[in-house]
Amino acid sequence: MEFYASLKSIAMHVPSERVKNAEFQQFLDTSDEWIEKRTGIKERRFANDEEKSSDLGVIAAKQAIERAHLTPKDIDLVVVATLSPDFLAMPSTACVLSAKLGIENKPAFDISAACTGFIYLLSVAKAYVESGMCENVLIVGAEKTSSVLDFKDRGTCILFGDGAGACVIGRTKRLKESILDVQISANGNFSNYLYTPRTLKPTPFNAKEEALEPFLCMKGNEVFKLAVKTLLRDVEMILEKNALKPEDVRLFIPHQANFRIIQAVREHLDFKDEQVVLTVHKYGNTSAASIPMAMGEAYEEGRLKKGDLMLLDAFGGGLTWGSALVYFGG
């Protein structure tokens, strides 16, 4: 291989509106203590009515492109992961975001892998770069999850937040600046554990079908058990495959779904506190955006430096899951 795929830059963006746990007490039977005890979440950000996922994503994308010392014209491919797209079926959020960046006549498409979306993005970008098909790939996790939440459902609406993270994936000849490994998987037999019902209206030919509200639905207890079991196995597999141990990893950056899930994985693998990046307490679960947001925050705080090895892992609707070992190419 002449070159490897490399994570050249990272940036994140969140909306300005903070929503604290206590604010849910206005319309739900809940409390700040109840939410934080079960999830570790203290607050989250919600976009305003005019903002869409692409609006959040484009801010992070512009900064990521700038940090990579590139211009939008240098981008060969745009891929977006989201469960809250700007439009129901088309156009893709990637196409909308490309237009806002001024990128024309370049391929753009979305990935639907829910909270595992960013790991899937890394897999796609790595393949395109290392095959020689693209030199610079922009990947974006962008979510306005507040647009798909049922605010009468205490089991879901308290968990999620809005935000975006973006990366530029380019080339390097150095292994220790590369996306070392990515593994992704799915099992559709559990698709009813996490889903958003279809919103297409019945036609005169199938009037018996009922149009459902497009709200996120989740079997919380079942998802929790499967997530912990699956993530532990997946992380152990990728470390063993690459002859690495937890102490070889500079930062462990898991999907920020629930503090208890993160803690279970951290304790089992014996990661030290300084290795673990946590943002769930202030942003909640931002689905496909959570890992790049956490990476972006670690970078801005000076915790993530060039050459650092990151272990990423995620689990989401599909069910989907995946993990990655990534050196920060800087």
Curated annotation (Swiss-Prot):
SUPFAM superfamilies for this protein: Thiolase-like (SSF53901)
The EC designation for this entry is 2.3.1.180
Q: Which UniProt keywords apply?
A: Acyltransferase, Cytoplasm, Fatty acid biosynthesis, Fatty acid metabolism, Lipid biosynthesis, Lipid metabolism, Multifunctional enzyme, Transferase
Under the GO molecular function aspect, what terms does this record hold?
3-oxoacyl-[acyl-carrier-protein] synthase activity; beta-ketoacyl-acyl-carrier-protein synthase III activity
Q: Where in the cell is it found?
A: Cytoplasm
Catalytic residues in the record: 115, 255, 285
Looking at the record's lineage, which domain of life comes first?
Bacteria
**InterPro entries, alphabetically?**
ACP_syn_III_C, ACP_syn_III_N, FabH, Thiolase-like
The secretion signal range is: none
Which NCBIfam families does UniProt cross-reference here? Answer: fabH (TIGR00747), PRK09352.1 (NF006829)
Function description? Catalyzes the condensation reaction of fatty acid synthesis by the addition to an acyl acceptor of two carbons from malonyl-ACP. Catalyzes the first condensation reaction which initiates fatty acid synthesis and may therefore play a role in governing the total rate of fatty acid production. Possesses both acetoacetyl-ACP synthase and acetyl transacylase activities. Its substrate specificity determines the biosynthesis of branched-chain and/or straight-chain of fatty acids.
In the record, the note on similarity to other proteins reads:
Belongs to the thiolase-like superfamily. FabH family.
Q: What name does the UniProt record give this protein?
A: Beta-ketoacyl-[acyl-carrier-protein] synthase III
Q: Per the UniProt entry, what species is this protein from, by scientific name? A: Helicobacter pylori (strain P12)
Supply the gene name: fabH
